[in-house]
Amino acid sequence: RSLVEERGRFLMIPSEEISAMAPEGPVHVNATNIKEVIFPLEGETAHAVLEANLRAVHEQAKRTGREILPHLNHPNFKYTFTAEILAAVTADKFFEVYNGHMSVNHLGDADHPSMERMWDIANTIRVADLHAPPLYGIATDDSHNYHGNPRAAPGRGWVMVRCRHLTPEKLI
């Protein structure tokens, strides 16, 4: 961290991909600005697993007094999630509308909507039927390799934030 972080110019924020399993498939939740590791929680459905892990993130935030940003990673990975589940889990405010990894199916297929279409469906349900706030989309590159395989390299998806102060408290 001391090699790259520069006050006011470059900031590293502690984060974790909480990786759990549900009967429908994998459930991955990112938690940004954590203080300590959050161990994955299981459940009987993808909906229940997502809610349990979001609850664990919110509990750490409350206990530590630290703002933590959770988001659902790559809902179309193994087609674990539907737009209806995304809409119903109103504790989640963010999800990956784009993930640059080659295996996450962000374009969907003949039987599953693309992430962009899923986002439209989920927000229509949230706003019109549940009277809940919309779900915001973010992008990540999901880097797994930093040298070699360009299909899992950095730089294919990111989030830019305009912020007066480069601190976790102001960004999150």
Q: Model-derived features: where do they sit?
A:
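Extended, charged catalytic domains and RNA/DNA-binding interfaces, predominantly
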Residues: 1-172
